[in-house]
Amino acid sequence: MTPDLTRREILKGATAAAALFTLPTSILAQTEGPLTMATISTRDGTEIFYKDWGPKDAQPVVFHHGWPLSGDDWDNQMLFFLGEGYRVIAHDRRGHGRSQQVSDGHDMDHYAADVADLARALDLRDAIHIGHSTGGGEVARYVANAEPGRVAKAALLGAVPPIMVASETNPDGVPLEVFDGFRAALAANRAQFFLDVPSGPFYGFNREGAEVSEGLIRNWWRQGMSGGAKAHYDGIRAFSETDFTEDLKAITQPVLVLHGEDDQVVPIDNSAHKAIKLLRNGTLKTYPGLSHGFFATHPDLINADLLAFARS
């Protein structure tokens, strides 16, 4: 750096500082005090972060993220539905993202209760709930038990219901050893595991000829690492061993089930193909060749189908 450049930079800095002191005190006052995030306190005192955009009198669309991510996973869909005139809401599940990293309560009953508390706090009525993967299980558990008038419709994308893990009653499910492997990998090196998942099966980037998005991989890792290891560890049991059979049977509202046919994380035969048979008012649409994270890799396609369902 030359002496002349140094003098110029000093003068620029001095000018900026002088300009700051000429700002109205009302503007400066806006920056005083701690910055706060939008949160609600649930019935057990857990702080849940949420985003709430759009007209408060518009129909709400509530987005439920997958494991181990956050509400940010729905940014594309939130902006899309916002542009279509909806009120859009996304929360970070307890222990995930910006929500409180509590030690306990990482199970579907607590997840659904947190959603109920959020819906009550924001006075959400006639809402459309859209859930991906673990978030689809959360939607099923919540909608099946929701207060009258709260829910209009639901959509399950690459969702885990009715139940993932193999058992005597679910012999073609995913072996428990697979989920034990998830837990071991997370405990050993969560940062590396959270790179391996999105760069491999989650978006289908391990398939020959796949168009890999480095941005999606990094964003998945960013979201995952912002949450708590305890919540993520316990959450594996929540999404793999929870049985949603009775929840699906109890739902009376219209439900759209969307699933990628090349989903390597939540195989379609053990999820969507079974779930649709349990729903009273369900519609199934599948996508040849698409992966578990299909709404992120093909947002225009999925957004159009979700919007058509919302308007139907």
Show where each model-derived region lies.
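Catalytic active-site module of serine/aspartate enzymes centered on a nucleophile-bearing elbow/loop
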Residues: 282-312
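Active-site loop/oxyanion-hole signature of alpha/beta-hydrolase fold enzymes
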Residues: 83, 90-134, 296, 304
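N-terminal export signals
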Residues: 2-3, 9-29
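Short beta-strand/loop motif that positions the catalytic acidic residue
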Residues: 251, 257-259
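Conserved alpha/beta-hydrolase "acid-adjacent" motif
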Residues: 264-270
